[in-house]
Amino acid sequence: NTAFGFAIGIQMLMWGLTGPIFGALADRYGGHIAIISAFIFYTLGIYFLYTGPNTGIYFQIHMGLLIGIGLGGTAISIPMSVVGKHFPLSTRTIAMSIVTAIGSFGYFLSPIFTTYSLKEYGWNYTLFIFTLFLITGLFAAYFVRSPSEIESVEKTSDQSFKEALSEAFKTKSYILLVSGFFVCGFHI
């Protein structure tokens, strides 16, 4: 379906564009603010798919724009950076590995649950259940706090977002990495 494909294209574009914004928000105000903000967009997108009109521009706004913005702050990058800041170097790898494993298990269970729910209850009720899951995540994100000063955690810099972008785009390996991901999206 063209409308669905276009919405997913918008979603992926918004995810990529808003990820750095949520990263800057997390650095400046704390991971919980970035994740809560993203969960609000994500939850509204799913909720409006459940309750609102779902044709034309509304579908593109709900499925593409709102959910895409929400993914920018709830997908793996922002939560992993928050987890990384909570642990000293000696235990950071194991902590991040556990979070990645739990997230991957969620990716494994989600299609199974979704398929079952769609067959048994239909798409509307399935969207309602996902709205409840996201509300749970929204409340859980409230309890994510910035870590207190830990001696073994390296000192963070006071670099601004603009300075960080400038430094990144002067680094050849970063430009190659971004180019690789950019090319990946041309199939959309």
Describe every region a protein language model picked out.
Residues 12-20, 107-108:
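Residue-level signature of mid-helix packing/kink "hotspots" within the transmembrane helices
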Residues 18-30:
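Helix-to-loop junctions at the C-terminal end of transmembrane segments
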Residues 40-54:
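C-terminal ends and interior cores of transmembrane alpha-helices
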Residues 56-74, 182:
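Hydrophobic core of transmembrane alpha-helices in multi-pass small-molecule transporters
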Residues 73-87:
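Intracellular juxtamembrane helix-capping segments at the cytosolic ends
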Residues 98-149:
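Helix-loop-helix hairpin linking two adjacent transmembrane segments in secondary transporters
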Residues 145-163:
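Flexible cytoplasmic inter-helical loops of multi-pass small-molecule transporters
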Residues 172-188:
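Extracytoplasmic gate region of multi-pass secondary transporters
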